[in-house]
Amino acid sequence: MQEHLVVTLDGKDYLVEPGTNLLEFIKSQDTFVPSICYNESMGPIQTCDTCTVEIDGKIERSCSTVIDRPMTVNTVNNDVKDAQKEALDRILEKHMLYCTVCDYNNGDCEIHNTMDAWGLQHQTYEYKEKPYEKDYGPFYRYDPNQCILCGRCVEACQDIEVNETIRIDWDREHPRVIWDNDVPINESSCVSCGQCATVCPCNAMMEVNMEGNAGYMTDTEPGSLAAMIDLTKKAEPGYGPLFAISDSEAEMRKERIKKTKTVCTYCGVGCSFEVWTKDREILKVQPSHDSPANKIVTCVKGKFSWGHINSDQRLTKPLVRKNGEFHEVEWDEALNVIADNFTSIKEKYGPDALSFISSSKATNEESYLMQKLARQVIGTNNVDNCSRYCQAPATKGLFRTVGHGGDSGSIEDLEKAAMSVLIGTNTAEAHPVIASRMKRAQKLFGQKIHVFDIRKHEMAERADRFYQPKPGTDLAWLSAVTKYIIDHDLHDKAFIDEWVDDFDEYYKSLETFTMAFAEEATGIPESELIKFAEECAKAESVVICWAMGITQQDIGSDSSTAISNLLLVTGNYRRPGTGAYPLRGHNNVQGCSDMGSMPDKITGYQSIEADDIRAKFEKEYGVKLNPKAGKDNHEMVEGIHDGEVHSLYLYGEDTGIVDSNINFVQAAFEKLDFMVVQDEFLTFTATYADVVLPASPSLEKDGTFTNTERRIQRLYQALEPLGDSKPDWKIFQAIANRLGFDWNYKHPSEIMDEVARLTPLYAGVSYDRLEGFNSLQWPVQPDGTDEPILYLEGFNFDNGKAKLFPLSFDNYFKQDEIYDIHVNNGRLLEHFHEGNMTYQTPMIKYKVPRAFVEISPELAEDRGIHEGAEVKLISETGEAVLQVHVTDRVKGKEIYIPLNNDAMENGDLGAINLLTNSDVDQYTDTPSYKRTSCRLEVITKRGKSPLNPNNFRVNKKRHPQYSVQVQKKWERSDYVFPGNQVDK
């Protein structure tokens, strides 16, 4: 195989690797070639024709040329320049240059920059206005009269995000971008990811927040912009002066528009991007090709749901309860109240009478300081975080089998896999950017997707095969599939012999897991399970993703263990495109646990009960540490009721809504002697507190987050804290010092340096190594070497071998005649959990204004109810009143309740956790949220739908195609390739 090819570029020879994109090679040599439709994150689209060069004497597009032979390339001769000029002129026939008064004139308009760099002074063809008006969606708008039909938005929607809404209608007299079958944006299947606006090279697609806000001359009254455009064009007869003036205005904008790299504060994907702000106004979010987890992909929350930052609901001063009511006070008074109460409770009842709940929304540094406050200052290990509510069972299963409690590879491995198996994860709504990577792999590269879920969500609809097991029975089919693979000699014996212990004992434990047993337990036909087992065993590479549908069961740890067992038996660890991926729910739930906000583990999952570990931290902290494991979230609530816990300090967690059996939890709050809540808002939980502290959200501080793939990333402060709110780390420091300690951190980087000294997993982590879009995936060696793929050097046990873990199953979920309906629950795309942050963005609330219950058509018919009906759901622990959305996403007596009940406005009305009980996973105390039964009482039989009629879920059909279908453009009678014109 030839290693290099000779490419002669403008008379100079270069050695180039075969398969290199010609345009990328030309750019790498600092040679300018226009390329308006090309984007490095999407590849060649071939619509603009501006990148033409001469290849071996013929004018061709460089963007779609792969270097597969020696070639001579000319970018400067007259024929090339003439072809490029023709292509540029055709663009200006569709796009009016009025740069100085354009909101997009921020230094990154690719039409402006290309025309300027090329040296275009006058256009040959007159601009032709199209017979279309602007189309406004809730978050972005489309201006057909500025659209050059490059197709980037189509490529992004169809083949990057794979939402499959946007197309170009090439057949009409005046082609334009359309949504679905040519409906307005707001009536389409658009999910408002915003990537079309991200990739648009000009002002055709633009965020609504940008319009009229970006420039010095764009904040005009409606109608006056047209006059300004006319005036500008008359005053700037050639493009040279226009570019000079607009460049000066763009330079001025740098003084008013601040661009700050940050990391998304919602789910665990860890999307990074620049946030553009003007004063406190958030203009746009712009992802980058350099964004390690998401590249240029976003979802509606990360791109647009930032209303919470400037919400009038933000807390700006501390609140102290006096005579039953909250009063605003200065920080000094609030800190004194906290210090006095912590001290008196500790003196009266001992340190273990105080408990602390950390936040998966906060930074690593802040999570570290909360556990340090609990352990060093108070002397208790009663500290936990919300991984107890969701991911602790997955971590347990991985600790049992492979030794690390995190994803075994990277997000890009999910794209590389030959087969993806999704179990109990609504990925397209809970982790939409990851779902896009998998949808793309399926659509373009043939990845096979298998989905096991009780609900027919989007990934189930798209799956190559969809299986609907009975609730809580995944362990049965997972173990039966594993047994079948071994029984039929399909297991990876070489991998097992070299890398896995305890095979014989494990295989013996599978004796009862026959396919017949699995069919009876799960309801999945034996033939389907056999076919899946054979495909799984024979696939070149397999990844398994799972989430709360697995972990929030009372056998969540065992089911997670069964997943890892299957991967070990088939040899699907230690290679690209393989492994276990328990998709983390929050932006920093992985990091919060990494930082030691756990009752039995200190940073990096080091046991607090180990003498040598405690000794290391005691030397750093200067105090003796409590050797006894503390209480977890579940045990804290029990401890309050039992009189063992008298004080609770929580931050960034609405425990009174998100814990299970919240009637029981709220009753516990009422029994506390003293309660502190620290948050952006006066949350439902905060209404029970004695002191409420105003905390700053992510855009108002520096720090790091660790995402689902163990990726540690920096976020930078974009805005000053609102009012008297403070970053959590500063609040913890103030409390520690008020209690007699001498914390003196000047910046979060110093906190991370301390973490690195104490934590082998983070040993090489530093802010310098995380500069900009750089990131590290733990474990990180002292020299900064990280591990995107775990276990390449062996598994995280003393002998380097993984362990197969025997399991059993007899845990059938049965409903009785009274509580005859199974209640499933989870996220919606638009909202995050209870919605405290997302409901602060008006257009998010417009899309999904309230919580509701999904009911199957057959259950609706049985109960005589219709869309919009109001029903009361009653369980053994409580009741909730909700409106009905009838959908075939659920079947039979399965119902689904989204988590977003807007608790700050509605209290606990309609909250799913009024119905859940206190049952937990026996190994982790994770609540069994998914094992809930209820009965249904009809209040009204029909009403207004709880969903906005423009919501994409309401009878909206996708319109998939491959890319922009540029051949349709080429087939038009009015199209001639510029190179052919030059040849003529």
UniProtKB/Swiss-Prot annotation:
[4Fe-4S] cluster 2 binds at residues 147, 150, 153, 200. Residues 252-984 are annotated as: Formate dehydrogenase. Binds 1 [2Fe-2S] cluster. Binds 4 [4Fe-4S] clusters. SUPFAM superfamilies: 2Fe-2S ferredoxin-like, 4Fe-4S ferredoxins, ADC-like, Formate dehydrogenase/DMSO reductase, domains 1-3. Its cofactor is [2Fe-2S] cluster; [4Fe-4S] cluster; Mo-bis(molybdopterin guanine dinucleotide). GO terms for cellular component: membrane. [4Fe-4S] cluster 1 binds at residues 95, 99, 102, 109. Residues 3-79 form the 2Fe-2S ferredoxin-type domain. It catalyses: formate + NAD(+) = CO2 + NADH. Keywords: 2Fe-2S, 4Fe-4S, Iron, Iron-sulfur, Metal-binding, Molybdenum, NAD, Oxidoreductase, Repeat. This is Putative formate dehydrogenase SAV2309. It comes from Staphylococcus aureus (strain Mu50 / ATCC 700699).
